[in-house]
Each structure stands twice: as C-alpha cells, then as structure tokens.
C-alpha cells in the first residue's frame, strides 16, 4: 500500500511538473506572438537613421536620412515640393495650398496659422515644413515630442527663395531636381534684369490691402522683386514685412506706379486703389497694375512669374521686339 501511495505521489508530482513546463512553454509562445503583433507597421522603423541639419531659422533639427512622409503648412512650400518632383510624399497641406491642382487631392490639416495638431500627428509625417518662425511656438514642442521634425524656411528676398528650394531638395532627396529648377529660374531672372538694367527705376507703391492700407516693408521678399523688375518700392525702408501705412504718407511718396496684387487666391479683393491714392501721379497717368497675387506673394517658384509680370508692367518698352 505504501508503495502504491509513493508511486501515486511520484506520478502526480511528475504530472504537475510536466503541466508547469507546458504552461511555461505556452506563456513564452504567447509572449513571442504578442510581441510580434505589437511591432510597428513599418518593419524598418527601428532601423531609421537620422542626421542633424540647421533649418533657415538657425534651429538644429534631426531628420531621417530618407524622408518619405511630410506636410507643408504654406502654399509656397507646397509649390516647391511639387516643382522638385516630391509630391508623392506629401501627406498633408493647408486649405490655402491650391497649386498645383494635384495638391488639392492631399488632405488639408487646417490653415497656415492654426493647423490641426491632432490631424498632423495622425498622418505620421517625418517632417513638417513651415514658412515663418512665427508659427513655431504654437506647436513645435508637441510635434517634436512625437518625433516629427519641424523645418522652418525664411525668405526675405529672391535669393532666399532659391535657397529654400535648394534646402528642400536636400531634405527630400531631390537635390538634382532642385538644381535643374534653379538653373531655369535663374536664367529667367537674368533675362528680366538684363532687359531693365538701363531703365530708370520706377517709384512703386505696393498696396497689400486698401482698408486698412497695408504695404510691403524692408523684410518682404516682394521688395526685392520690385527692385529686380526695375522699380523701387517707396516703402522699402519701412520696418517689417507687411506694415500698416497711412494714406497720407503713401500719397506724399508720389508713386509713379501702384501695384495691386489681386486675383488668384484673393479673388476680387484688393482690386481698387485706396481712396487717398487716387490723387497720386500713378493714377493720373494710368499706371495702376493688377498682378496675380499668388505669383507675387508666395515665395516659391512662381515668384519668377510675378517678377516677369511686374517687369513687363513697369517697363513694357524693354520687352517689345
């Protein structure tokens, strides 16, 4: 009887031991299975390598060596992305990004100054491109806490625009395309500058809006466009980029030409000269020029279109054959 009990005890002990081993195996297999299920959708996510660069505001940021998903929060930057052949990786844009037509198929994440941070994060971009440092404080820290780099462009003249094209080409792996585009753009700029270089500069008042009256200051890249087109902005020394300006001061400057950026995204807005300026030499001589706002106000590739249109308006005789 004692032997039977001992054998029974040993059998039970062995059975419990096998059961524990089996449970351990099952648990281990389960952990392996669930660990595999919890891996990121991108099997190379943990293999991504980064490098540090400086954006155009002087900030040091880390970007992947290969950037495949990105968002643009400025129409000009969206235009650059497509112009250098990088549109396939654009996963988000602002509601103002309307050119080229393909851009409108990309999901909008709000406007330039108040984008939806939640939507941006959900789209999983590696880099978000913004056009001015003034946008940074609102969302940079939150985006970077989700490992999203924020690259800032900062163009105060046409060379600054070209530099932005070059840098986006670097970040997006499209430098050869960017260089080819820049070669074409610089050639067109050269044609304009050669045509107007011997012409006396035209005094220009650039009316951003009439009520209230806003214009361009020394920090606006459009001030450089006016100069390259054979003009001189009468507000070139005013601090800032888009200063509010008194009608009396504008009239006292006696502009020979008034430029109204209208059409494009602005529609019919800003299509009338401010009341006080109707007594200016520009109006008296019929030198009021309406030019597509999207070409003039966006520091991207089409700024050269704006330069050509502006030069033809200020110096039509320089382009007649």
Where are these regions (language model features)?
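Bacterial signal peptide processing site
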Residues: 38-41
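Short helices/loops that flank or line small-molecule/ion binding pockets
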Residues: 117-124, 146, 245-254
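His/Asp/Glu-enriched short active-site or ligand-binding loop at hydrolase and phosphoryl-transfer sites
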Residues: 94, 219-242, 262, 287-290
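Bacterial N-terminal signal peptides that target proteins for export
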Residues: 4-26
């Amino acid at each position: 009887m004692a032997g039977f009990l001992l054998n029974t005890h040993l059998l039970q002990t062995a059975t419990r031991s096998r059961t524990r081993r089996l449970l351990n195996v099952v648990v281990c297999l389960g952990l392996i299975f669930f660990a595999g299920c919890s891996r990121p959708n991108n099997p190379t996510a943990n293999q991504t390598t980064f490098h540090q660069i400086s954006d155009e505001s002087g900030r040091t940021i880390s970007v992947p060596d290969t950037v495949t998903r990105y968002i643009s929060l400025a129409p000009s930057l969206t235009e650059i992305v497509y112009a250098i052949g990088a549109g396939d990786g654009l996963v988000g844009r602002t509601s103002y990004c309307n050119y080229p037509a393909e851009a409108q198929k990309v999901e909008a994440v709000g406007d330039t100054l108040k984008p939806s941070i939640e939507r941006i994060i959900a789209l999983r971009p590696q880099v978000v491109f913004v056009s001015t440092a003034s946008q940074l404080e609102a969302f940079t820290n939150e985006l970077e806490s989700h490992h999203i780099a924020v690259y800032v462009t900062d163009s105060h003249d046409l060379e600054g625009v070209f530099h932005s094209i070059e840098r986006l080409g670097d970040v997006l792996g499209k430098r050869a395309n960017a260089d080819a585009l820049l070669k074409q753009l610089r050639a067109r700029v050269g044609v304009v500058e050669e045509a107007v270089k011997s012409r006396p500069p035209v005094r220009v008042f650039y009316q951003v809006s009439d009520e209230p009256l806003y214009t361009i200051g020394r920090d606006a890249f459009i001030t450089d466009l006016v100069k390259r087109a054979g003009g001189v902005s009468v507000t070139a020394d005013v601090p800032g980029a888009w200063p509010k300006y008194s009608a009396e001061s504008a009239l006292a400057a006696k502009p020979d030409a008034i430029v109204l950026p209208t059409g494009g995204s602005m529609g019919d807005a800003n299509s009338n000269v401010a009341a006080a300026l109707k007594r200016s030499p520009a109006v008296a001589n019929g030198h009021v020029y309406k030019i597509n706002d999207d070409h003039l106000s966006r520091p991207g590739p089409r700024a050269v279109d704006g330069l050509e249109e502006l030069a033809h308006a200020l110096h039509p005789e320089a382009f007649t054959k």
